[in-house]
């Protein structure tokens, strides 16, 4: 069985974070493992508290996984400090980790893509320009998610200087807590199973 590691925060409501990641990876037929960056008190209406893991403990979590069950893919979610990011980067480099969702591909929604690109996005052309800028700046593929009122939930994958649209249909449902975690975990699961990035996104 293929394996996938999620490095992210814990969601006490189970709708996002580590809990959503593990559910998604399991549903996609891979063995899920986790390294928790923070405990959060949250639900569908917001976050009321965060208790961050220490850098030393996060390093121990990652070591425990890589020295026993080497993951076929890694998904990185919520990381709340630069110090923890440094630990993750150092450990993944030292273990020569493969298929890292957030290093190989980032999955920003529209507000996140605006921050990463420094551009205002109001239409599909804006998504393309922002995705291109992010890809060039961070040297990775970008899956820009269009569900924030820009279109009918069409997503854009930008890689190697080219864009590919994945057409979606907006679902009329306010329960969207954790959808980004679920999508990135599904992509990581498919990468772990050997699919290329386009097929993993589709």
Regions found by a protein language model. Give the residues of each.
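Glycine- and other small-residue-rich loops at beta-strand/loop junctions that grip anionic moieties
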Residues: 10, 76-77, 145, 176
């Amino acid at each position: 069985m293929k394996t996938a590691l999620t490095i992210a925060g814990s969601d006490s409501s189970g709708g996002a974070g580590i809990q959503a990641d593990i559910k998604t990876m399991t549903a996609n037929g891979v063995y899920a493992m986790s390294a928790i960056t923070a405990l959060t008190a949250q639900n569908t209406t917001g976050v009321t508290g965060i208790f961050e893991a220490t850098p030393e403990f996060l390093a121990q979590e990652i070591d425990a996984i890589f020295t026993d069950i080497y993951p076929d893919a890694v998904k990185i979610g919520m990381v709340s400090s630069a110090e923890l990011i440094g630990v993750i980067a150092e450990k993944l480099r030292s273990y020569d980790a493969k298929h890292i969702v957030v290093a190989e591909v980032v999955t920003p929604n529209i507000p996140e893509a605006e921050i990463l690109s420094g551009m205002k996005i109001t239409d599909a052309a804006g998504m393309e320009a922002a995705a291109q800028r992010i890809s060039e700046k961070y040297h990775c593929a970008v899956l820009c998610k269009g569900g924030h009122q820009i279109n009918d939930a069409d997503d854009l994958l930008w890689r190697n200087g080219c864009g590919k649209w994945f057409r979606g249909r907006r679902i009329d449902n306010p329960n969207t807590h954790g959808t980004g975690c679920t999508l990135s975990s599904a992509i990581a699961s498919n990468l772990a199973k050997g699919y290329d990035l386009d097929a993993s996104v589709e």
